[in-house]
Amino acid sequence: VPKQFLEINGKPILIQAQILELLQQMKLKSGVAVLLITHNLGIVAKAADRLVVMYGGEVVEQGSSMDIFYRARHPYTWALINAVPRIDVKLEEELTTIEGTPPDLIQPPTGCVFHPRCPYCMEICRKRKPQVTADGEHISFCWLNHSMAPKVEIPIRQERE
């Protein structure tokens, strides 16, 4: 049960950075766990040891920060990473977005909750919830990770020259 709750969204960036630094120091000194709930992947990359990626109220991927950022296995995670603004691209380039609209949580779609927006959607995605696949502590819920699924190239942007 959390002993403290601290809201940092909406605060100036420098204040957010100072709060995160203070939380990191507290974590190291006292060994307490810090739970961050955020959509800001910059904060996540800097502060989190482990990540749980959720979409439509469901876990779609979970693992270490390194696994999620460098070996993501779910199309929603790929889309999130690709949507992060980068300083090494021209300002004229449009930001990457995730096509479609978020699911209706009152009447969620059958099958995989991400399938209506997923560019890799297969028939099974529309009908059945994905089974968990695990690689050590890195887990994901996506039919693309099934041994019988077609292989796809992971579309995470590479560093540009």
Show the residue positions of the predicted features:
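P-loop NTP-binding/switch modules centered on Walker-like glycine-rich loops
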Residues: 19-93
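N-terminal glycine-rich phosphate-binding loop and ensuing alpha1 helix
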Residues: 1-21
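Short capping/connector residues at structural and topological boundaries
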Residues: 2, 10-11, 48, 92, ...
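Residue-level preference for short coil/turn positions at secondary-structure junctions
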Residues: 1, 28-30, 108
